[in-house]
């Protein structure tokens, strides 16, 4: 099984790009493949925007970056054609998930963090669906702390909390399902949510079940798996 690293380059660089690096165990075998989005093109930026905060006689500049190791079977022909395009919202959801794990001072990024990342991003169709069904960010945070507990106040989360095994499997499931669909378009946040749901013993799945998400709701999400934006308001205006 090959490992793909999704790298989110900080905003401080000029002409930032996102790359997927294939790693087969040795640095010499890695290659860089642009992770593209039809919305923003190949120069897609998925980091949390850098921001400056001004305090009297104090100036600070912060910038966040994210690196995610995504396991997925290597294409038979060795080409990059099997790597699906990711929507900007899906990429941001993963980045926000890692930051949520860091906020909670967790040592790794789990399925519960991916779920929180989807809700933090908040503008995708599936995020709106979750909120409409009572699955909110605050509820997920509370359930996460109830299920996994609080981290030690003196513990410092890694700069890039690694993905847990269930989280890796959830992302691999999303990528594989997108490849199997043979549908043009990007890998959306719906694939990520259903990837979390597919891991039956994961924290993310348990939290979703606790908040009322079930197989019927999962089937509703499946109907719009290839849509990240609700365009129904445009259809009504035509």
Swiss-Prot record:
Chief site of localization: plastid
The keyword Cell division appears for this protein: no
Identify one Gene Ontology CC term for this UniProt entry.
Answer: cytosol
Compartment(s): Plastid, Chloroplast
Q: What happens when the gene is disrupted?
A: No visible phenotype. Clpt1 and clpt2 double mutants show delayed development, reduced plant growth, and virescent, serrated leaves. Clpt1 and clpt2 double mutants are seedling lethal under autotrophic conditions.
What keywords does the record list, in alphabetical order? Chloroplast, Plastid, Repeat, Transit peptide
Instruction: List the InterPro entries.
Output: Clp_N_dom_sf (IPR036628), Clp_R_dom (IPR004176), CLPT1/2 (IPR044217)
Organelle targeting peptide span: 1-64
| Top-level taxon of origin | Eukaryota
Repeat 1 as annotated region, ranges: 86-151
Q: Which residues form the signal peptide?
A: none
Cite the residue spans of the region called Repeat 2.
163-228
Residues annotated as domain Clp R: 83-228
Pfam families this protein is in? Clp_N (PF02861)
Q: How does it assemble?
A: Monomer and homodimer. Binds to the CLP3-6 ring (P-ring). The dimers monomerize before association to the P-ring. Component of the chloroplastic Clp protease core complex which consist of at least 16 proteins: CLPP4 (3 copies), CLPP5 (3 copies), CLPR4 (2 copies), ClpP1 (1 copy), CLPP6 (1 copy), CLPR2 (1 copy), CLPT1 (1 copy), CLPT2 (1 copy) and 3 copies of CLPP3 and/or CLPR1 and/or CLPR3. Interacts with CLPC2 and CLPD. Interacts with CPN21. No interactions with CLPS1.
Function, as annotated, reads: Accessory protein regulating the assembly of the plastidial Clp protease system. CLPT1 first binds to the heptameric P-ring containing the CLP3-6 subunits followed by CLPT2, and only then does the P-ring combine with the R-ring composed of the clpP1 and CLPR1-4 subunits. Once the core complex is fully assembled, it then associates to the CLPC chaperone partner to form the functional protease. CLPT1 and CLPT2 are partially redundant.
Matching PANTHER family: ATP-DEPENDENT CLP PROTEASE ATP-BINDING SUBUNIT CLPT1, CHLOROPLASTIC
What does its UniProt record remark on the domains? The MYFF motif is functionally important for stabilization of the overall ClpPR complex.
The text of the family note is: Belongs to the ClpA/ClpB family.
User: What name is this protein filed under?
Assistant: ATP-dependent Clp protease ATP-binding subunit CLPT1, chloroplastic
